[in-house]
Design a protein with these regions (language model features):
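Short, small-residue-biased leader/transition segments that mark boundaries at the very start
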Residues: 2-8
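Active-site beta-loop-alpha junctions of metal-dependent nucleic acid enzymes
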Residues: 81-85, 102-127
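C-terminal domain-tail junction helix/linker
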Residues: 189-256
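Two-metal-ion RNase H-like nuclease active-site motif
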Residues: 71-81
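Basic, flexible linker segments flanking DNA-binding modules
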Residues: 9-66
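RNase H-like two-metal-ion nuclease catalytic core shared by retroviral integrases
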Residues: 138-140, 145-153, 162-186, 194-206
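Short conserved beta-strand segments at catalytic cores or DNA/RNA-binding microdomains
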Residues: 66, 79-101, 117
Length: 256
């Protein structure tokens, strides 16, 4: 059916999970690859294992998109505070609409990144998570260096696929890097995130995502996202559309 084909194009291994869970009326025995596919554990022992990049390199990412060009891509990164600042921002950039969300992490560790993924999945459900985040491109920072923990969701179902830029090649995720410039207008380098709350960060992202972009034909990322992303995702993000004449993209926005 067309629905089955759509899921397959997004992510083959996610399709097998849907079949296994009974969401689709196909049996695993009809799919030989499923028998051979081993569900990976979410063990933290992989954190420093360079074999984690096998099948997840930037070249693999390009090959996947060449075969499935309509796949939604999310670029992921972190924004650091000043020296001595413990908290960091996890940023998720939806390439389809240029919307970026940021989450405050207690520290730059994979367990905190996983906690954000888990929270989103619990709210949206595994199927919706996989639909919205079928493919995530990030760098090789230590906070992302446990793909199994990020890819595995509830009941060990694969919820996404993680791919990595080449070493020292952050330019391979240009949309994320470009949007960080908006964050730096409000939180310049040297800013500590330790005194901010998630409410502060969400307010900042509401202003950033309400800002019209020439690259979007004068639309804002938030307006475009409302057309491109499921409504439950927009609701979950908790962003507020700010009128053009009230948008603040300076440090004054978060001054206590």
């Amino acid at each position: 059916s067309r629905g089955l084909g759509d899921v397959y194009k997004r992510q083959e291994k996610t399709l097998y999970n849907y079949i296994e869970s009974g969401a689709l009326s196909v049996k695993n025995i009809d799919l030989p690859k499923k028998v051979k596919y081993k569900v990976r554990s979410c063990s933290s022992s992989e954190a420093a294992d360079l074999t984690i990049y096998e099948g997840r390199t930037y070249k693999d990412y390009q090959a996947f998109l060449k075969e499935f060009p309509d796949t939604r891509v999310t670029e992921m990164d972190t924004v650091l505070g000043c020296e001595g600042s413990k908290k960091v921002l996890l940023t998720l950039h939806f390439d389809c609409c240029s919307l970026m969300m940021a989450y405050l992490l207690d520290s730059k560790e994979v367990c905190h990144v996983k906690a954000i993924f888990d929270s989103i999945e619990r709210s949206l459900g595994t199927f919706s998570f996989s639909s919205v985040f079928p493919l995530v491109l990030t760098d090789r920072g230590g906070e992302f260096r446990n793909p199994a923990a990020l890819e595995c969701g509830q009941e060990n179902l694969i919820r996404t696929s993680i791919y990595y830029c080449d070493p020292m090649c952050s330019w391979q995720k240009p949309h994320c890097e470009k949007n960080h410039e908006y964050i730096r207008k409000i939180c310049p380098k040297g800013t500590s995130f330790d005194d901010y709350s998630q409410e502060d960060i969400t307010l900042m992202m509401s202003h950033i995502n309400s800002s019209p972009r020439q690259s979007l034909g004068g639309m804002s990322p938030l307006k475009l996202a409302k057309l491109m992303l499921p409504s439950e995702v927009i609701d979950y993000l908790g962003l507020t559309e700010i009128p053009d004449d009230e948008i603040v993209l300076t440090p004054a926005l978060l001054q206590k």
